[in-house]
Amino acid sequence: ALCAAAQVRAQEIAQSFSHTRPDGTNGFTVLKERGIVYVACGENIAKGSITPRRVMEGWMNSAGHRKNILNANFTSIGVGYYLDAAGTAHWVQLFTA
């Protein structure tokens, strides 16, 4: 379910590159829509990096993104990837605890 939620978000950030959803709601509302129960959550978004290695390098070199990845309180991760018609890659990591 978490990967499905991340996939939804990857498609959404292709429309609007933001932690806010295209309909104006918080990005984490996708978790509730998918029936995911959590006490804490985080989201990393990226676009343009064509390989998983490159997107991870970018996130690990960014303090805020790295903090999410290394947060020991998060117990689950879902990853979404979407390649738009122009060939731009969109990536999402969703974390929950």
PLM feature spans:
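Short, surface-exposed glycine/acidic/tryptophan-bearing loops
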Residues: 2-53, 69
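Disulfide-stabilized extracellular recognition modules
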Residues: 46-97
